[in-house]
């Protein structure tokens, strides 16, 4: 009999594992499972598999030395598993008898290599498929077959020519040794090793991953990414190359860094997707394309930093994407079978307003048309129903359906769930051009008119590139500069099949913001909304410092919740720097954090100057509300759009927008020099805001859009 020992640090997928155990038993193997995950909750499932034995490994280090526990806290996950299991006598006995050792997950890999070294187990594997092949090899050797001896392997000085089955634990020990990886020489030698000629792909991949883990443990994140990318450059298999480059890029993105090999990683996924598409495997092609889009539009690149590759050359950034065969398929318009029917004249318009959870900009629209005699309104929150939420954000399935020519089960599911709503509605108004827009355009809308509103956020995501805009009749933009950006990014929006484009401001009831201000408000700067890196509140702090050099009466009031440090490492780093910057100012009473509020008008009553410090915006609602309250508006010339045909300077009146913190301080000092000057400037701003952006004005544009009125 061939003895097989499975080791797992997390619960395996029990269905898959059960099927595999049956295959191992059919091959004449005895099977044992040792795991650091809790075995008791799945005891019945494991018993049904008819394993020859199971063993619960220690789940923690509670009864070990303080020094070891301290070391474990700093160790990689795989090392921790080994620390827990290494002294377990049952595990050692099972390993001593094992012919094949199998790591069921990444956390168990290091333990398997250590056991393979100690007990000279020739067949040590990560994954079930290679382990099953190993059983056949052991059987073929017969009883005379002896275990191979694993000699030390100096991958720094020699070419690595052994198969991954014989890779010794020395590799892992060297790769995770911080002193070696902290050394420039050591790190360079390891990178040389992973690109050595003649190394089998499996060995190259395994070695590069261990090297990357060690470098990251030693604090060399970019070095870890470089090792993986270097190994990938030597691979010919498109799938493996794409996978390794993906891992390299994610190492840096996970630390909030701009990856040096992003272009290569995206190109590799696209090449893999094209190959799978050519082979007729639409599922694999969609997985690779989904990863390419995910990497190319990762939020760390475009949302959680103060700039984005799109700021320099948006069309150039997406050009390689659209040169691929799979994206050529995605950009082909499917169109609609019949044109949208005109609004009915013999009954109220049936208007379906829909979104997925985010209804921040819908309240006034719902209120108006819910009480309009010419409209029968229904509201659908896709996130409120589990089945609808599942299809609304199934990006990978959207891609597969398009690549398969609309023959997937996903389209059937969307048809079944969404057709009743489309059949009822004359017009569908979908807010936010994200997942639900991609979902909805996988099916023909019939004669229902489809209207979608795109704010600003969507431009920095992958969703517009997954949406068939030929099935959208009207696309609403909130500002000209957003329209320019999105049309430069999405080829379909520049073609004959593009929807009608409209520029309509967000629905805001600004009349309630005109509350009396105290004389002290004149010296209070305000920033409404600081929950995103793009708001760049550090710019506002710089303005405050410049003002206080002239007059120490100026203060800064921050309205809104803080940035969520869990969003990304880039967000966490900015939040940490910002908190450090304002801590002494808060102690002095110079900066006041008012936190989130449902009563923004009251908060603005204490603010005399409203700032827009952002690096990019669609239309900055906080600035518009502040202007309506008669606070003096001072808007940064948003760097993302500065100097372009449409920008903050074309969106707001002349004089509101400044090019630097110096200009901002100068404008504030001039407009607040006297109480009369401040009140006059605020009055003019309020009059402009109320006559331009207030809901009674903007609602006419929606009436015209939905009802053809006006």
Task: Please give the residue ranges for each predicted region.
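Acidic anion/phosphate-binding donor-loop and adjacent secondary structure
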Residues: 134-137, 336-341, 460-464, 503-522, ...
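Nucleotide-activated donor-binding/catalytic signature segment of Leloir-type glycosyltransferases, i.e.
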Residues: 570-596
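A charged, aromatic-enriched C-terminal amphipathic alpha-helix characteristic of glycosyltransferases
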Residues: 512, 673-706
